[in-house]
Swiss-Prot record:
Belongs to the bZIP family. ATF subfamily. There is a cross-link at K206 (Glycyl lysine isopeptide (Lys-Gly) (interchain with G-Cter in SUMO2)). The gene is Atf1. Residues 9-18 have a biased composition (Polar residues). This is Cyclic AMP-dependent transcription factor ATF-1. Residues 31-90 form the KID domain. Residues 239-260 are annotated as: Leucine-zipper. InterPro entries: bZIP, bZIP_sf, CREB1-like_pKID, Leuzip_CREB. It is found in: Nucleus. The keyword Nucleotidyltransferase does not apply. It comes from the Eukaryota.
C-alpha cells in the first residue's frame, strides 16, 4: 500500500512538469518551421525573379526560328502577289534592225525579217537600191533559210540561198538553178548561217588545139630550165667556196712544212 501510494505521488508530481514543458517545445518548433518556410519562400522568389529576368532577356533577342519564319512568310506573300497580279509583269518588245553586209565590190546586202534580200550599191548622192529578192516557201511550216557567199571570177561576192546553185558558163554569163525539196513535218527553225566563200571560176575547156598544147609544153620547159640553171649556179658557188677553203688549208700546211725544215736544219748543225 505504501509503495503504490508513493508511485501515485511521483506520477502526480511529474505531470505538472510535463504540462509545463510541452507548450515551450511546441513554440520553438513553430518558430523553426516558420523560419524554414520564410527561407524557402525567399529562395523560390529569388529563383522566380532570376528566371523571369532570363526570359525577358531572351524575349528581347529575336530567335533564328522567328527570323526564318518571317522571311518565309514574306517570300510566300510575294509569290502570291505575283500569282494574283499577272498583269504587272509586262514583256517589252524590241525591234531588231535588219543586218546589213557589204561585199568586196562595195555592194550592200540587207536581210529583211520576212526573208527578203535587198541589194544596194553606193553612189555619189547616197545608197541607191537596186533590187529586192523575196524568198517564199510553199509549205505551211516556215523552214530555215541558209545563205552562203559566192564569189565570181571578177572578185565580186554575192549571197545565194543554199537551195540555189550558181553556174558561170564559158561566155561569162551567170545562171542560177534552184533545188526544190519536199516539205517535211520535222522542219528546221528559221536561221541564217554564213558559210565560207565559194569561188565560182570559169572552168578551162579541154581542146585538142596543137598550138595551145605546144605553148603549154614550151612554158613548162622554160620553167624547168630556169630551175635547173638556178640549181647549177648554187652548186658552182658551193664548189668555189670549197676550193677557197682548201687553198687556205694548203697555204697553212706549206708554211708549217717550212718551219719544220728550218728547225730540223738548225738541230743537225
Amino acid at each position: 500500500m505504501e509503495d503504490s501510494h508513493k508511485s501515485n505521488t511521483t506520477e502526480t508530481a511529474s505531470q505538472p512538469g510535463s504540462t509545463v514543458a510541452g507548450p515551450h517545445v511546441s513554440q520553438i518548433v513553430h518558430q523553426v518551421s516558420s523560419l524554414s518556410e520564410s527561407e524557402e519562400s525567399q529562395d523560390s522568389s529569388d529563383s522566380i525573379g532570376s528566371s523571369q529576368k532570363a526570359h525577358g532577356i531572351l524575349a528581347r533577342r529575336p530567335s533564328y526560328r522567328k527570323i526564318l519564319k518571317d522571311l518565309s512568310s514574306e517570300d510566300t506573300r510575294g509569290r502570291k502577289g505575283e500569282g494574283e497580279n499577272p498583269s504587272i509583269s509586262a514583256i517589252t518588245s524590241m525591234s531588231v534592225p535588219a543586218p546589213i553586209y557589204q561585199t568586196s565590190s562595195g555592194q550592200y546586202i540587207a536581210i529583211a525579217p520576212n526573208g527578203a534580200l535587198q541589194l544596194a550599191s553606193p553612189s555619189t548622192d547616197g545608197v541607191q537600191a537596186l533590187q529586192t529578192l523575196t524568198m517564199t516557201n510553199s509549205s505551211s511550216t516556215q523552214q530555215g533559210t541558209i545563205l552562203q557567199y559566192a564569189q565570181t571570177s571578177d572578185g565580186q561576192q554575192i549571197l545565194v540561198p543554199s537551195n540555189q546553185v550558181v553556174v558561170q558558163t564559158a561566155s561569162g554569163d551567170m545562171q542560177t538553178y534552184q533545188i526544190r525539196t519536199t516539205p517535211s513535218a520535222t522542219s528546221l527553225p528559221q536561221t541564217v548561217v554564213m558559210t565560207s566563200p565559194v569561188t565560182l571560176a570559169s572552168q578551162t575547156t579541154k581542146t585538142d588545139d596543137p598550138q595551145l598544147r605546144r605553148e603549154i609544153r614550151l612554158m613548162k620547159n622554160r620553167e624547168a630550165a630556169r630551175e635547173c640553171r638556178r640549181k647549177k649556179k648554187e652548186y658552182v658557188k658551193c664548189l668555189e667556196n670549197r676550193v677557197a677553203v682548201l687553198e687556205n688549208q694548203n697555204k697553212t700546211l706549206i708554211e708549217e712544212l717550212k718551219t719544220l725544215k728550218d728547225l730540223y736544219s738548225h738541230k743537225s748543225v
